[in-house]
Amino acid sequence: MANDKKKLTVNDIKNKKIKGEPIVMMTAYDALFAKIFNDYADIILVGDSLNMSFHLKKETISATMEMMLYHTNAVCAGAKSSFILADMPFGSYSDERSALKNAMKFFKQTEADAVKIEGGMKNVAIIKRLCEEGISVMGHIGLMPQFSKFEGGFKIKGRDETEVKRLMDEAKAIEQAGAFAILLEGTINSVAKQISDSVSVPVIGIGSGADVDGQVLVWSDMLGFFEDFKPKFAKRYLNGAELVRQSVQTYANEVKNRIFPSEEFSYKG
């Protein structure tokens, strides 16, 4: 498919909520897949999820700035019109100074359009500071993978009134701090709708039901390449791992049986 999309901006993303147009967001970690996704994704997230689904670690927290910068550059090389969102890895925004320093690296060393930061009230001041410096920020609340060790696993949010109030307060505070959008993960559907209705910026869900302003999935979950773990919310549109496995097996068999390369794939003198 030829790409005739114009480069999407922060205003384009925000206007989609105003127009009632669902936002399509997905992850990518390399140029090859980013180039394919570019034709369909409004936002491509270079997520620290790559630590699990690309580097096969057990969690996201050991992802480094060097790793995220490398993969963000790769994605930017492949996707020329999608809005590129880079994840700030665990430990890279523990205070305003380090957050500003590391966010600047994404803007100076890659072509990222914005950064994403996990955390509620404790990171509102950091989000505000980055926005004041001209760095576009997407907040991330609800289930936060970077807190998985602290919380003893991946916990669904919005199960009681106290938690619902906290999430609502966090969303409003993040909006007021200047964030252009909010990622809401692993949150009860009805609560996600309340949050989306309570703020003017887009709320993009993952595992948070349909009543938000857009959806994001990890590409290797969506296309069936990551077989170690399948989240309940991740619909598989393809059994990619099995298709690749069959193709590689066929190639290996053809080499072993001297079927490949045939004359069709050989140079003649």
From Swiss-Prot:
The active site is at residue 185. GO terms for cellular component: cytoplasm. It catalyses: 3-methyl-2-oxobutanoate + (6R)-5,10-methylene-5,6,7,8-tetrahydrofolate + H2O = 2-dehydropantoate + (6S)-5,6,7,8-tetrahydrofolate. Binds 1 Mg(2+) ion per subunit. It is an enzyme of class 2 (transferase). Pathway: Cofactor biosynthesis; (R)-pantothenate biosynthesis; (R)-pantoate from 3-methyl-2-oxobutanoate: step 1/2. It comes from the Bacteria. Its cofactor is Mg(2+). Keywords: Cytoplasm, Magnesium, Metal-binding, Pantothenate biosynthesis, Transferase. Its EC number is 2.1.2.11. It is found in: Cytoplasm. Pfam families: Pantoate_transf. 3-methyl-2-oxobutanoate binds at residues 48-49, 87, 116. Belongs to the PanB family. Catalyzes the reversible reaction in which hydroxymethyl group from 5,10-methylenetetrahydrofolate is transferred onto alpha-ketoisovalerate to form ketopantoate. Homodecamer; pentamer of dimers. This is 3-methyl-2-oxobutanoate hydroxymethyltransferase. It comes from Campylobacter curvus (strain 525.92).
